[in-house]
Design a protein with these regions (language model features):
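Catalytic cores and motor modules of nucleic-acid processing enzymes
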Residues: 1-92, 98-101
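Short linear sequence elements within intrinsically disordered, low-complexity coil regions
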Residues: 9, 17, 22, 30, ...
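Residue-identity detector for glycine
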Residues: 8, 22, 32, 51, ...
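Compositionally biased, low-complexity repeat tracts
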Residues: 4, 28, 137, 178, ...
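Acidic, glycine-rich low-complexity segments with interspersed aromatic residues
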Residues: 68-177
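Compact mixed alphabeta submodule
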Residues: 171-224
Length: 224
């Protein structure tokens, strides 16, 4: 059974539209009474129609065999759900990337612009070198032989699906979501190094994106 929890769930705990009835559900008594109001019913109908229209326009053209749409924006929770993970993961547990053994999916989440006041062990110099090439850094304290790094480098032979999500800045006031940029595979270029001002090692990996980043999004992310 897939289970998800979020702050959004807490916000809407008082909005009960359905109630459990045996093995099925029925419209809640309070919501049923509201539906008798013609003005409310019409407004609700318009909202539902708008939602369906927006879905068809923005989310119906799925990327390859995924439930994701290229260049649309997703939260961590959205990504976990659409990649069919059994449980949602909080951002702290993901920490830039996380491998799900059951689905063999390995989403990578990149904050392109790093804050100046973060610790040296989290100042990863992830950067695009072209529209379809990315240099990404592993978590600190990793070597070439680390399991997560090996899963990246041997993704093809292990059947691991690496997916890329990028946002310009984690404190972006406009959106807390990541642009979905599709699948990527390692080019074979990887090197271990010691992170500046620390004694921690990390691994730099070059990636080839399956689909080059759309020009307007690329310029928005890369340009300061």
């Amino acid at each position: 059974m897939i289970q998800y929890t979020s702050t959004g769930k807490k916000s809407y705990t008082q909005c009960v539209f359905l109630e459990k009835e045996g093995a099925d559900y029925r419209v809640s008594k309070s919501f049923g009474e509201m539906l008798k109001n013609e003005e409310f019913y019409k407004s609700l109908e318009e909202i539902v129609e708008f939602g369906i229209s927006r879905y068809k326009e923005n989310y119906s053209r799925r990327y390859q065999d995924t439930d994701l749409v290229l260049y649309q924006k997703y939260t961590y929770e959205d990504a976990c759900r659409l990649l069919k993970w059994e449980h949602n993961e909080v951002p702290l547990n993901i920490g830039g990337y996380k491998y799900d053994k059951k689905t063999k999916t390995f989403p990578v989440f990149i904050n392109y612009d790093k804050q100046e006041d973060i610790s040296d062990t989290t100042k990863y110099e992830d950067h695009f070198t072209s529209y379809n090439r990315l240099i990404a850094i592993s978590k600190s304290g990793r070597s070439i032989e680390s399991e997560d790094v090996q899963n990246f480098l041997k993704a093809k032979e292990r059947g691991i699906d690496v997916q890329l999500f990028v946002r310009k800045n984690k404190d972006d006031k406009i959106s807390k979501e990541f642009y979905y940029l599709g699948r990527m595979m390692p080019t074979g270029m990887a090197k271990e190094f010691v992170m500046p001002n620390t004694n921690k090692t990390a691994v730099e990996i070059e990636w080839a994106l399956d689909t080059p980043v759309r020009e307007d999004i690329y310029k928005y992310i890369v340009n300061g």
